[in-house]
Each structure stands twice: as structure tokens, then as C-alpha cells.
């Protein structure tokens, strides 16, 4: 079974996003990752991965205590399912300004584990003015942030016994497939 975890953008969603997120005007739409000023390594196109269900974490940052760091290994693609993209819907002002965040401590721990990518089902690992600097900080450490994933609940619910697999189509647009 294959599970598509990319967000499909409708014309209405693109219009709404452009009205609520200035970066949407320059291709910062839908499921994507920002290469920042780095080169995306080809070996990153196939990685083991894990999806952590952190959907019960509300009104605070997602922290290191919310996941089992022992399950995270070097070069892994680590995803976080919050349900926010399904609950709020993509493109609203709230979607871009009140989304969940990963704590700086958790991000540092993931960088220390030398993961290759971090995926989230919301607009960014940090909000507002911290968003772009954290994406750059992670990229400087060889880690790319994949934003606006959807359907991660299907991956969590599928109880995958084998590692998550995915395929990157381009550096600007991402189509992630997980093998179950």
C-alpha cells in the first residue's frame, strides 16, 4: 500500500495562502522543503523514517519528552503528526500564525542524532520571525525541513512495521510516498 502525504493545492487554497502568508507569493506553497542556500544531497532521496503521533500535545511546544528519541537514528526522516493541517485547513491566517511548534531543545536533539529531514503537518517548525532562521540553522547542519505534510494519520494508523520510504520529485515540490 502507498500513502500519499503531500498536500494538493487548489486554486482557492493558493489564493487564501497568498492572502495570509507573504512567502506564498514566492513558491512557499503546499508540501515543500526549503533548500535554503544548500544543495540537496541525492542520497537523501531514500531514507528510513518514523512518524511520531504528537496530536495530543496542545497549547505548548512539542518537546523532547513527547517522543521516544531512542527510535531516532542517524540519517532518518523524522515526521510529526499533529493533525493541525486537517483540523485548521491549509491557507488560513491561523494556519500560518498559530500552528504547533517544535521546541528548540527537540530540534537540537534531532540535529545531534544527525537526522537528514524533519517533516511536519503544519507551516514550519517555528513560527513568525523564528521560522526562516531555524530552517537555515537546520540546513547548515545538513537537515532539511519538510512542511505542510498531510495524511500522516494514515501512516500512523497503518502501524508500519517497515521503515517509511519516500521519493523526492524535485527540490521545490515534494511528493512523499510511504511504503506500508
Describe these PLM feature segments:
Residues 1-180:
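Active-/binding-site microenvironments in catalytic and ligand-binding cores
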Amino acid at each position: 500500500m502507498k500513502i500519499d502525504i503531500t498536500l494538493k493545492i487548489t486554486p482557492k487554497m493558493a489564493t487564501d495562502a497568498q492572502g495570509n502568508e507573504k512567502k506564498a507569493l514566492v513558491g512557499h506553497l503546499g508540501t515543500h522543503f526549503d533548500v535554503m542556500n544548500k544543495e540537496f544531497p541525492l542520497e537523501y532521496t531514500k531514507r528510513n523514517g518514523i512518524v511520531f503521533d504528537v496530536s495530543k500535545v496542545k497549547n505548548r511546544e512539542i518537546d523532547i519528552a513527547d517522543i521516544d528519541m531512542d527510535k531516532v537514528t542517524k540519517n532518518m526522516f523524522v515526521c510529526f503528526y499533529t493533525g493541525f493541517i486537517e483540523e485548521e485547513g491549509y491557507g488560513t491566517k491561523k494556519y500560518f500564525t498559530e500552528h504547533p511548534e517544535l521546541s528548540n531543545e527537540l530540534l537540537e536533539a534531532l540535529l545531534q542524532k544527525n537526522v537528514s529531514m524533519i517533516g511536519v503537518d503544519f507551516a514550519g517548525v517555528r513560527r513568525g520571525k523564528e521560522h526562516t532562521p531555524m530552517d537555515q540553522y537546520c540546513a547548515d547542519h545538513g537537515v532539511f525541513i519538510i512542511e505542510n505534510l498531510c495524511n500522516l494519520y494514515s501512516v500512523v494508523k497503518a502501524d508500519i512495521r517497515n521503515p517509511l520510504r519516500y521519493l523526492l520529485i524535485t527540490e521545490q515540490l515534494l511528493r512523499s510516498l510511504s511504503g506500508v
